[in-house]
């Protein structure tokens, strides 16, 4: 199982889009400024997901950025991604590990539940994600995580990801509470200047 103690920074998640050219045009300039990229597209069919994931795999490899596939271990295996992110209904860690191998990065959404994080760690997950910390338009959720949850999860010994409506000004608070990675979608992709936005998120780790 890979060790990710040095994982720190911006965990960028792609938006839902069918425009592959636009997705790549926006994402490529961001790769030098992020730690991980997660491919997530809930609107695309299987063929488009494969095409987009394949293109992003090549781009990430060129920039040395790990690519994580959202919710689909089979797609991760197909494109040679570095890992998979599992939500509540996306299968078990053990099954993903069996498919992707010992070196894969497997993350689990834990929402506002420390017990879910403990179970994920026990099952062999490589990181745990909590959120939403703030209101977000990206995903409808009534679950609200708190900074105290990040602190409590330190005992797991895994990288902790914070997600959900986070702005650059809120990054220092979450990092102080224990977040190793800040996951963001619209805060970067919907910004007038996505590169400046991702740099602002990154700067929050040094404040």
Swiss-Prot record:
It comes from Xanthomonas campestris pv. campestris (strain ATCC 33913 / DSM 3586 / NCPPB 528 / LMG 568 / P 25). GO terms for cellular component: cytoplasm. InterPro entries: Aldolase_TIM, ThiamineP_synth_sf, ThiamineP_synth_TenI, TMP_synthase. Condenses 4-methyl-5-(beta-hydroxyethyl)thiazole monophosphate (THZ-P) and 2-methyl-4-amino-5-hydroxymethyl pyrimidine pyrophosphate (HMP-PP) to form thiamine monophosphate (TMP). It is an enzyme of class 2 (transferase). 2-[(2R,5Z)-2-carboxy-4-methylthiazol-5(2H)-ylidene]ethyl phosphate binds at residues 136-138, 165, 185-186. It holds the Pfam family TMP-TENI. Belongs to the thiamine-phosphate synthase family. Pathway: Cofactor biosynthesis; thiamine diphosphate biosynthesis; thiamine phosphate from 4-amino-2-methyl-5-diphosphomethylpyrimidine and 4-methyl-5-(2-phosphoethyl)-thiazole: step 1/1. Its cofactor is Mg(2+). One of its GO terms (molecular function) is thiamine-phosphate diphosphorylase activity. This is Thiamine-phosphate synthase. The keyword ATP-binding does not apply. GO terms for biological process: thiamine biosynthetic process; thiamine diphosphate biosynthetic process. Mg(2+) binds at residues 71, 90. HAMAP family: TMP_synthase.
């Amino acid at each position: 199982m890979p060790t990710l103690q040095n994982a720190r920074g911006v965990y960028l998640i792609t938006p839902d889009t069918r425009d592959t050219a636009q997705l790549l045009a926006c994402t490529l300039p961001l790769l030098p400024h992020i730690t991980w990229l997660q491919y997530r597209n809930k609107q695309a069919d299987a063929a488009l997901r494969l095409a987009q994931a394949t293109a992003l795999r090549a781009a990430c490899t060129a920039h040395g950025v790990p690519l994580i596939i959202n919710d689909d271990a089979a797609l991760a295996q197909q494109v040679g991604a570095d890992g998979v992110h599992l939500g509540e209904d996306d299968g078990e860690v053990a099954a993903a590990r069996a498919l992707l191998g010992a070196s894969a990065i497997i993350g689990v959404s834990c929402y506002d539940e420390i017990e879910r994080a403990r179970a994920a760690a026990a099952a062999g997950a490589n990181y745990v994600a909590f959120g939403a910390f703030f209101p977000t338009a990206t995903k409808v959720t009534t679950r609200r995580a708190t900074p105290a949850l990040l602190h409590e999860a330190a005992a797991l010994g895994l990288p902790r990801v914070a997600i959900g409506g986070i702005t650059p000004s809120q990054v220092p608070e979450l990092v102080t509470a224990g977040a190793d990675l800040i996951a963001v979608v619209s805060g970067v992709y919907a910004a007038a200047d996505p590169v400046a936005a991702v740099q602002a998120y990154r700067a929050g780790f040094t404040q």
